[in-house]
Amino acid sequence: MAIEAAALLVIDVQVKYMEPEPMVTSDGPDLLEKCGGLIDAARANSIPVIYIQHVDPDAPPDPELIAIHPQIAPNADEPIVQKTFGSAFMKTELENVLEQRGLSKLYMCGLATFGCMNHTVLCAVCRGYDVTVASDGHGTSPEAGPVDEQMAHFNRMWERAGATLQKAKEIEQRFAT
């Protein structure tokens, strides 16, 4: 039985952020595996999957680089919401997509912890959505500082803001109940 009014948002897991050097989780280079597990569990339990895709407004789009990573590619019936700002809510169709489908509980995974994940989580909480973040299912660049410290910092901040934090495997199990 699907969780009522729930959706999985997969944020910016695009080729340009995963190749040649992937953004990583505190467990290492396993973001695609964790997001893929969440996607598979959502699909198996009739929970809509919505992809968010960042497009740089100041650069000509390179279809190969901005594509959702092929390892977690969307099905033909799964929406891809394009954005040009950090938040998936700012000047996009995301709220319309959620409203049309009656979705108010959002599970999130993706990139980048310090950027688009952060902005999207906080905007969703401020808009009154029930937000659960995969605490080990968001990734960042080691160049921005120690990955485990970055993830722990943002996880604490999101929890203080009102989001729920669960490991990706726990969310997969939740989807199945």
Task: Give the positions of each predicted feature.
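N-terminal nucleotide-binding beta1-loop-alpha1 segment
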Residues: L8-V13
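Active-site-adjacent betaalpha module
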Residues: A2-A7, E33-D40, P57-T177
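Short acidic, Gly/Ser-rich segments with clustered Asp/Glu that frequently serve as metal-coordination loops
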Residues: K16-P20
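A short alpha/beta connector and helix-capping loop motif
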Residues: P22-I50
